[in-house]
Amino acid sequence: MTNSPVCRAEHINHIGIAVKDIDSTLEFYKTMFGAISSGIEEIEDQGVKAALVRVGASQLEFIQPTDENGGVARFIESRGETVHHICFEVDDLQGKLDKLDNEGVRLIDKTPREGLSGMSGFLHPSSRAGILYVLVDRNTAKR
């Protein structure tokens, strides 16, 4: 990889956390931290229901599996309820995905897809330290 950033990020859009029970998780964060939820949305093609939650200037995404054989269910089974991904906000998402692909970074998505937080692209956890990274296009990002 080069010395200059291949994929300069504007900031972290959110941290995703895999949970078994999104309702009790949302209630806990509301009661303990004054978190404000965007509401729960079902994302059928990913086998999850999810909610973006604002805590001050920061944002979290809680993800509960709805498909017991899906990726998030397997993630919770192997790692428990914990941080699932880090989402960076970027300009020109497709351009960033192309650059990363050209640099040999293993991608889950070579083209953007609609996600809860906006048009997104996923980098495979094997690309760095077993962490799932998500890039969200700044122009479609929910804040």
Regions found by a protein language model. Give the residues of each.
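Short, solvent-exposed interaction modules
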Residues: 76-102
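Amphipathic alpha-helical segments
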Residues: 21-36, 101-103
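Conserved catalytic-core motifs of GNAT/GCN5-like acyltransferases
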Residues: 36-44, 111-114
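A short, acidic/glycine-rich surface segment
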Residues: 38-39, 69-74
